[in-house]
Amino acid sequence: MALLDFFLSRKKNTANIAKERLQIIVAERRRSDAEPHYLPQLRKDILEVICKYVQIDPEMVTVQLEQKDGDISILELNVTLPEAEELK
């Protein structure tokens, strides 16, 4: 009987399979979502503020928004500042 139970317990019911597939689809959608509509304007505004104090190339500023599990969003801002000698 134990051998029969072993083989029968390995089968997954269709609800669990469907749940796993749906979780995969949701995770893929979260990763592939387009950036929010406000992100380009946010990048532009941040660049304008930085340019008030330091002359930089607009390509030296990157803004990324990363979605984590649940309702957590991480805004990553990378700015490459010129050398101190170039500021004078």
UniProtKB/Swiss-Prot annotation:
Q: What are the GO cellular component annotations?
A: cytosol; plasma membrane
Its Gene Ontology molecular function terms?
Answer: ATPase activator activity; identical protein binding
* Superkingdom field: Bacteria
Tell me the disulfide pairings in this chain: none
Q: Which UniProt keywords apply?
A: Cell cycle, Cell division
The biological processes this protein is annotated with in GO are: division septum site selection; regulation of division septum assembly
Gene knockout outcome? In a minCDE operon disruption (minC-minD-minE), cells divide not only at midpoint but also at their poles, yielding small minicells and long rods. Loss of polar localization of several polar-localized proteins including GroEL-GroES, TnaA and YqjD.
> Which Pfam families does this UniProt record tie to the protein?
MinE
Q: What does this protein do?
A: Prevents the cell division inhibition by proteins MinC and MinD at internal division sites while permitting inhibition at polar sites. This ensures cell division at the proper site by restricting the formation of a division septum at the midpoint of the long axis of the cell.
As for family, the record states: Belongs to the MinE family.
Q: Which HAMAP family does the entry mention?
A: MinE
Q: What is this protein called?
A: Cell division topological specificity factor
Q: Which organism is it from?
A: Escherichia coli (strain K12)
> By which gene is this protein encoded?
minE
